[in-house]
């Protein structure tokens, strides 16, 4: 992603990419994300408003996504970072809708259908080392890094940092509900009925990752 601090920079990047994803630096649960091919009046107003309030917009290519996933961590006051587990989740129009509840081994098996296990391990080590240096005790608590498997002309690849969430994520919630031994896999689903959000556990295997 490229940070753009002027309207002209944003337009130039969208033109370069043909179809782009625009993200506000600070947002939550997909609310600061726009998928843009052409800039209409609503998008133009949103860009100007975001630049005025937050100073810049992150612009990146629109990737041909295959799967969403993430890794969950905890950072400590001494600067160390501990890996907590994988997060396999589903989104709709960029907004989180549910997480797979399964053991770590089962989740790794799901992902290694697409990418090598060694790649997952190296990404995890890199994040632990890099975040330990960058945070260095300035933030203490849970955080998550969202990622995606994407399709390219040269095969499947990983975007290892779609965004970093310095908070307890739904991935952490899913880890606390996930089985520690092999059981029937479930989906932790978040739904909205027009008035409030509700969480439910779905056992339908066809809805899983």
Which residues make up each language-model segment?
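Conserved catalytic-core segments centered on acid/base and nucleophilic motifs
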Residues: 2-4, 10-11, 20-27, 32-34, ...
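A generic structural motif
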Residues: 1-4, 87-89, 187-195
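Glycine-rich phosphate-binding loop of ATP-grasp-fold ATP-dependent ligases
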Residues: 1-4, 19-46, 70, 94-111
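Conserved active-site and cofactor/substrate-binding residues in soluble primary-metabolism enzymes
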Residues: 66, 122, 172
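C-terminal active-site "lid" helix and adjoining low-complexity regulatory extension at the edge
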Residues: 154-158, 166-209
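Phosphate-binding site of ATP-dependent enzymes
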Residues: 18, 38-97, 144, 148-161, ...
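A long amphipathic alpha-helix within ATP-dependent nucleotide-binding catalytic cores
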Residues: 52-54, 61, 83, 95-157, ...
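Glycine/serine-rich loop-strand microenvironments at binding/catalytic pocket rims
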Residues: 77, 94-97, 107-109, 181-182, ...
